[in-house]
């Protein structure tokens, strides 16, 4: 199956999908990490988030990979299966050895959101391990395509599903 690139950056241009079944693969959508949505710092409930001992969880997106292929004989549906690489660190305020990390993948055309999947990735921390590298997915997204509109017309916007306070803190940290 065709693979697309795994790259760490704020914007991840897709090099394209490889060939499959002797045919040229259809162009894949471009995955994009939004800088303000690629980091998650979750604090103990009820804390103001000013002290390191209040940190429950830290997440950082590190990579995206996947594949795309036409799913029907008409060639008007493109299946894109996406995996997201994430580093997750357990903070001193996490009361258990596991956590659910909220993520999303949105299909956009320009600035218009056409589809969005929100899901949780369950993360277990082995005994005496504070940081784990995990992969979410594959998450399937089906996109309509035509001879005039390929998968390259779309973007896959990928990020943590943040609360308004978490998003504001990320934007402040980034100077936005």
Predicted regions and their residues:
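Bacterial N-terminal signal peptides that target proteins for export
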Residues: 1-5
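C-terminal motif of bacterial Sec signal peptides marking the signal peptidase cleavage site
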Residues: 12-16
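Bacterial signal peptide processing site
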Residues: 18-22
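N-terminal intrinsically disordered, cationic/polar leader segments
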Residues: 23-24, 63
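Post-signal peptide N-terminal segment of mature Sec-exported envelope proteins
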Residues: 24-48
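Helix-rich interaction surfaces within compact, conserved domain-sized segments
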Residues: 25-26, 114-176
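Low-complexity, acidic Ser/Thr/Pro/Gly-rich terminal tails and inter-domain linkers that flank the onset
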Residues: 50-75
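Mid-length scaffold segments of soluble, non-membrane domains
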Residues: 72-116
